[in-house]
From Swiss-Prot:
Protein source organism: Citrifermentans bemidjiense (strain ATCC BAA-1014 / DSM 16622 / JCM 12645 / Bem) (Geobacter bemidjiensis)
Name of the featured protein: Probable endonuclease 4
Cofactor(s) of this protein: Zn(2+)
GO molecular function, one term: DNA binding
Pfam families the record matches: AP_endonuc_2
Taxonomic path: Bacteria, Pseudomonadati, Thermodesulfobacteriota, Desulfuromonadia, Geobacterales
Catalytic activity: Endonucleolytic cleavage to 5'-phosphooligonucleotide end-products
């Protein structure tokens, strides 16, 4: 099973994402289900949902995950941003249920100066509300580790653990591990020893079975920079070795892996980056 793929565009209709993934050589795809820079997304019509499902079945793609829009901040204080965030994530869950997508990747959010403990509590409360309000979404939310910019939460594994354990629905969560974000937040995954120590820490905090997706991105900046800037595979500060480690780690053999690297014209760089990653697989 090919578990390497990319984030692909839904321009022209959500079903077009399937075609773009196939043409780029993806075995799996990640999508936004709406415009990522707008609060309000369109509901998916039954016809559009069926077309997406039919194309997906015919495509041979083994996994599709959604990524929530960047505007959402479930750690926000009560007010307009929090209200809009709850509505937007609820609509995301509803669209994914209609499309048959069972995993939503999301950035935990920013406490905006109110403190990490407060922000984490707000996230837990938000998800308790959302899971109860959208029973038709029976899948999982994958919390993505972050680079540690500003007051963003999720840059340490214990943040993710606290969200999962603080929710009334702990089994509804997994983790999406972003290599660029991990490195930028201070996890030394670029060498073998640091890689082992990082995933030992992950296993101790969360359990390795909670890791349900990877974002494979190189980093433009160095270890601990707290800057989220993705680079082509092998062209940044990470180099090729951490990707080789992940792709040949038996723990992650069945975990889907998505690139979010610069696209180039007509997505041709997705083809280049995926080809390079596949060349690192041993045996």
């Amino acid at each position: 099973m090919d578990l390497l793929g990319a984030h692909v565009s839904i321009a022209g209709g959500i079903h077009n994402a399937v075609d773009r993934g196939v043409s780029s050589g993806c075995g799996v795809i990640q999508i936004f289900t709406q415009n990522s820079n707008q609060w309000k997304g369109k509901a998916v019509s039954p016809a559009d949902a069926q077309l997406f499902r039919d194309k997906l079945t015919a495509s041979g793609l083994s996994h599709v995950v959604s990524h929530d829009i960047y505007l959402i901040n479930l750690a926000a204080a009560p007010g307009e941003v929090k209200d809009k965030s709850l509505i937007a994530f609820k609509e995301e869950m509803q669209r994914c249920a209609a499309l048959g997508i069972d995993k939503i990747v999301m950035h935990p959010g920013s406490h905006t100066g109110d403190g990490e403990e407060t922000g984490i509590r707000r996230i837990c409360e938000a998800f308790d509300q959302l899971f109860a309000e959208v029973p038709e979404f029976t899948g999982k939310v994958l919390l993505e580790n972050t680079a540690g910019q500003g007051t963003n939460l999720g840059y340490r594994f214990d943040h993710l653990k606290s969200i999962i354990e603080g929710s009334s629905y702990p089994t509804r969560f997994g983790v999406c591990f972003d290599t660029c974000h991990a490195f930028a937040s201070g996890y030394p995954i670029a060498d073998r020893d640091g890689y082992r120590r990082t995933f030992d820490e992950f296993d101790s905090a969360l359990g390795i079975d909670k890791l349900m997706a990877f974002h494979l991105n190189d980093s433009k900046k160095g270890l601990g920079c707290k800057v989220d800037r993705h680079e082509h595979i092998g062209a940044g500060a990470l180099g090729l070795e951490p990707f080789r480690f992940i792709l040949n780690d038996p723990h992650f053999k069945l975990v889907p892996k998505f690139i979010e690297t610069p696209k180039g014209d007509a997505d041709e760089m997705d083809v280049v980056n995926l080809k390079l990653l596949r060349s690192l697989v041993e045996g």
